[in-house]
């Protein structure tokens, strides 16, 4: 299990970092600089609003399907037609509910028009997620990794031509950015569908009432978790746009810091997506997933912590590098969001363990509590602190959810890290931040200071044994280990 995970996650990280880094820094950032804060802020708020009700598109079906197929790949043929029928019905519900709320909130005609395209994109993105859950469940992990970045590759090509191809005579429009996403999602959805039909042996679509009932009942716990996490992940920008004066501009300023946070958060998401089918297959065969979880935690949390603390030390300099004119409050919110990356990483390790072990009732209670806390804190802190209040809320919510997930895993399954290990990790992050604080005051350039801080962070991670590259290399090259792993899998 560990060798399979290590090889696949290294491939996924390499591909994703190359593609998504160019997307965030080359395309997304350029679009915001070109169209301006108000236009991008309106898009960002509407995009976040379109995400809020995506629970209705999935209702936990992708998570349930991934776990079910990973345990028994032949279930692809059994579930495919039934899930497809459910998704079509859920799509209608998603459009009705989202548009009803949009009209109730007083969205204007041009906002609704833009929202409709964004909603179509969410439908296709959700469909891709479900199709990929079949592919990863069947253990085609490298293929799933390629599909995970295929949409961004297509968006880069389309937006690159529009931005730098000399065909946008009157300037780039935010609507083109949205339509490029539509083209990308449609292409990847068709490719993913063809793969699932062929590799899964799906000959025809034949819904079955009993199977439908089983899917709905078992998918509801996933739905509660997905809904709660979606709300406390995306509600902030919607509330910023609604609660603050010049809300669209404020949402655009918040997006400046949130963009990098969202991009870095994809790393824990990738870890969770890769871990779930492997852990599920391991548990179904009676294997111990603790060694895999410990290795994944070391691989994720050490570099994530080092990078996040370094970025949080130089927030103004990083935003100045990325944007023509960082907005008011963007620096403070960016610093807080970078610190938030660490508990996000913890959540995706521990929540994946709970999901693989079918501890969804506990996970649902944790995430729903986090959602309620997040909404209340946002309503209080955004009017008081502005966009920094939303970032502060994110830090508090994610930290408490992370702690709750750790406690739940320790009490119901097994412990990954003891109190001493946790204390060492916090001490390592504190020392890295202290090193950066000192380096800022030496008078050297901020890039040199950041590079030295990163070096100090890597040295501390090695010293505290939070990363062990030689051990990982031996695991990859040890063929005997590979054979033993395959025998267990």
Regions found by a protein language model. Name each.
Residues 1-6, 170-178, 190-233, 274, ...:
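Interhelical loop/hinge segments that connect adjacent transmembrane helices in multipass membrane
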Residues 1-24, 77, 81, 209-225, ...:
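N-terminal membrane topogenesis motif
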Residues 4-62, 95, 99, 121-122, ...:
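Signature of the first transmembrane helix
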Residues 22, 57, 81-108, 157, ...:
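Alpha-helical transmembrane segments of multi-pass membrane transport and lipid-handling proteins
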Residues 22-39, 166, 227-263, 278-281, ...:
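Helix-terminus/linker motif at the lipid-water interface of multi-pass membrane proteins
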Residues 24, 29, 57-74, 137, ...:
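Helix-loop junctions and terminal segments of transmembrane helices
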Residues 112, 116-119, 145-198, 369-374, ...:
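Hydrophobic alpha-helical transmembrane segments
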Residues 436-489:
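Membrane-proximal transmembrane or re-entrant/amphipathic helices at the cytosolic face
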């Amino acid at each position: 299990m560990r060798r399979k995970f290590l090889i696949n996650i290294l491939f996924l990280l390499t591909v994703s970092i190359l593609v998504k880094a160019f997307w965030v820094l080359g395309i997304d950032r350029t679009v915001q600089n070109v169209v301006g804060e108000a236009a991008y802020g309106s898009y960002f708020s509407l995009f976040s609003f379109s995400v809020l009700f995506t629970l209705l598109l999935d209702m936990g079906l992708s998570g349930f399907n991934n776990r079910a197929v990973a345990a028994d790949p032949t279930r692809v043929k059994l579930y495919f037609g039934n899930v497809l029928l459910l998704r079509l019905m859920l799509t209608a519900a998603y459009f009705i509910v989202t548009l009803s709320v949009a009209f109730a909130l007083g969205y204007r005609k041009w906002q609704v028009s833009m929202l409709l395209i964004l909603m179509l994109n969410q439908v296709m993105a959700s469909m891709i997620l479900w199709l990929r859950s079949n592919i990863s469940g069947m253990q085609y992990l490298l293929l799933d990794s390629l599909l995970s970045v295929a949409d961004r590759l297509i968006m880069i090509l389309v937006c690159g031509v529009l931005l730098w191809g000399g065909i946008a005579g009157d300037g780039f429009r935010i609507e083109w950015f949205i339509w490029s996403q539509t083209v990308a999602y449609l292409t990847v959805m068709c490719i993913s569908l063809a793969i699932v039909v062929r590799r899964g042996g799906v000959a025809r679509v034949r819904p079955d009432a009993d199977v439908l009932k089983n899917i709905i009942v078992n998918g509801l716990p996933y739905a509660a978790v997905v809904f709660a996490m979606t709300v406390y992940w995306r509600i902030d920008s919607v509330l910023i746009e609604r609660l603050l004066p010049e809300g669209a501009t404020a949402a655009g300023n918040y997006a400046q810091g949130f963009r990098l946070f969202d991009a870095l958060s994809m790393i824990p998401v990738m870890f969770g997506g890769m871990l779930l089918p492997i852990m599920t297959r391991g548990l179904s065969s009676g294997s111990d997933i603790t060694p895999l979880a410990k290795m994944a935690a070391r691989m994720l949390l050490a570099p994530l912590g080092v990078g996040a603390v370094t970025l949080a030390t130089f927030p103004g300099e990083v935003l100045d590098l990325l944007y023509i004119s960082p907005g008011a409050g963007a620096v403070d919110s960016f610093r807080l969001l970078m610190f938030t990356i660490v508990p996000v990483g913890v959540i995706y390790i521990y929540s994946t363990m709970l999901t693989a072990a079918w501890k969804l009732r506990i996970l649902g209670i944790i995430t729903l509590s986090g959602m309620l806390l997040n909404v209340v804190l946002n309503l209080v802190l955004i009017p008081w602190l502005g966009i920094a209040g939303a970032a502060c809320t994110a830090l508090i919510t994610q930290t408490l959810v992370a702690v709750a997930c750790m406690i739940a895993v320790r009490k119901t399954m097994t412990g990954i890290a003891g109190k001493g290990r946790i204390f060492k990790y916090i001490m390592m992050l504190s020392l890295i931040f202290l090193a950066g604080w000192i380096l800022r005051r030496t008078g050297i350039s901020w890039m040199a200071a950041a590079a030295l801080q990163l070096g100090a962070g890597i040295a501390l991670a090695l010293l505290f044994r939070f990363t062990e590259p030689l051990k990982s290399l031996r695991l990859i090259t040890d063929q005997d280990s590979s054979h033993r792993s395959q025998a267990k899998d």
